[in-house]
Amino acid sequence: MQLITTENKLAGSKKALEIIEKGITSGEVNTLGLATGSTPETLYAELVKSDVDTKNVTTTNLDEYVGLAANDPNSYHYYMNELLFSKKAFKESFLPNGEATDAEAECARYEEILSEHPIDIQVLGIGTNGHIGFNEPGTPFDSLTHKVVLTDSTREANKRFFEREEDVPTHAYSMGIKSIMNAKKIILLAFGENKAQAIKETIKGPVDVNCPASVLQNHPDVTVILDNEAASLL
């Protein structure tokens, strides 16, 4: 596990972009795994400005809310299109289908996509409770793509994106921890003081399902990029 501490979110995002650009330019990155939320927004803005050619790169996404259409402004389809896909050309892009009526079939479909497009670099954020994707504390490490019941803390953290609290979805489709760990390389981004405790448990704590991100200690190629605040408890 390589640890990089930077001055702020912009510097950290640029450092992540350097790794991604190098992988794409060298031809080592054919599939790029993407995350959502506030953490990677600056990375995507920098990627849009970058000269790196992504038209032969396939993207996959970690998760999507259950029940939200792709054109819903709160869906991750919409988020990705607004921040990245409408501004940068990729070969093809895959996300779970939030409108799928058969959850089991949708999870199997997405796992098939992941097997056809092995992830070369997976970008991750981390929740204040240590979740990666929507894999909440207690999620088995051998989990594949599955339908998740969102915890109160995760819904609380995400309610700022919705007009009303009751509009925050209760479920999501998420790549499982095993699905994430199958990526050849992982870049974990964390910025801000509110992520410091989760980062401490991820890097220095035991590998335990109560902090899902701690499993990254077992991955052969992880780069953790922090700002000074997120690194403050290390």
Swiss-Prot record:
Pathway note: Amino-sugar metabolism; N-acetylneuraminate degradation; D-fructose 6-phosphate from N-acetylneuraminate: step 5/5
An example Gene Ontology biological process: N-acetylneuraminate catabolic process
Record's GO cellular component terms: cytoplasm
Gene Ontology MF term list: glucosamine-6-phosphate deaminase activity; identical protein binding
Active site: 63, 129, 131, 136
Keyword Phosphoprotein: no
Cross-referenced Pfam families: Glucosamine_iso
The protein's name: Glucosamine-6-phosphate deaminase
Organism: Listeria monocytogenes serotype 4b (strain CLIP80459)
